[in-house]
Amino acid sequence: SMSTCEVGSGFKQAVKNDVRVTKIGKFIRSTSIDELPQLFNVLVGEMSMVGARPHPIALDDKFSKLIQNYMSRYKEKPGITGLAQINNCRGETDTLEKMENRIKYDIEYSDNVSIYLYFKILFLTPIVIIFNKNVY
């Protein structure tokens, strides 16, 4: 969905109107089709359908120092979708406040995981994908 960046440039989060996103990439990212390969990770047991979305190591390193209990979001397996995503915490996390909000939902899910909440999130995810334009 994106063109490659320079070797050694490190992690760079996608942003609105990111020049690295290809034309076809814009479509597959806006419809979340680019998440489908993660189903393989679910099938082999490395991920769940629902859980905290995994972050790049660079973000984990950065925000684990800035946000109390950040790593407790990983008490459950990471997921393709989660409580944060159905509460419009998708897309760029360019401020500490946005990341704190996302982490709040991740921890809320891991502290209250239930079959009801799991299926509620699965049910609401496609609805949010259709109506939320905060993805690029």
Model-derived features: positions:
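Conserved small/aromatic sequence motifs within transmembrane helices
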Residues: 1-136
